[in-house]
Regions:
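HAD-like aspartate-dependent phosphatase fold
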Residues: 1-132
Length: 132
């Protein structure tokens, strides 16, 4: 068993994401995602795929077909029984729609106001270039 646990989101983190197109649609794999999950496993990480997607069978099949390594989906079986409802425990969470809290709520509120997922910034930049 691993000492380190990581939760990784799917959309916008492992695969490209612009908008929801249904549970059976997954964007293309982001370059480096597969090799990163392999390296994490080699380095002893327990990988939880953590997503708002609910169909674990579809997720598992897609990840297997895409050669994305993982240990579980939306749950950490290593958590105590009384802590299994809700967010899985992990040492690190990787998500395209997260802000790292640094203890300063004033700074965090400013970051929330200006926040855009990384792929949305690219789309806005392309649209801006097209309109010029």
């Amino acid at each position: 068993m691993s000492n380190k646990t990581i939760c990784i989101d799917i959309d916008g983190t492992l695969v490209h994401y612009e908008e929801w197109k249904g549970e059976e649609h997954f964007g293309g794999i982001i370059e480096g995602a597969s090799s990163a999950t392999h390296k994490l496993h080699e380095n002893g990480w327990y990988i939880i795929i953590y997503s708002t997607r609910a169909n674990k069978e579809l997720i598992s099949r897609f990840l297997d077909d895409s050669k994305i390594e993982f240990d579980s989906i939306n749950e950490n079986p290593n958590q105590p029984e009384n802590a299994k409802d809700g967010k899985p425990y992990a040492d690190i969470y990787v998500d395209d729609r997260a802000i790292c809290f640094n203890g300063d709520w004033e700074q965090t509120l400013m970051e929330i106001e200006k926040f855009k997922p990384w792929e949305m910034e690219g789309i806005e930049n392309k649209n801006e270039q097209l309109s010029n």
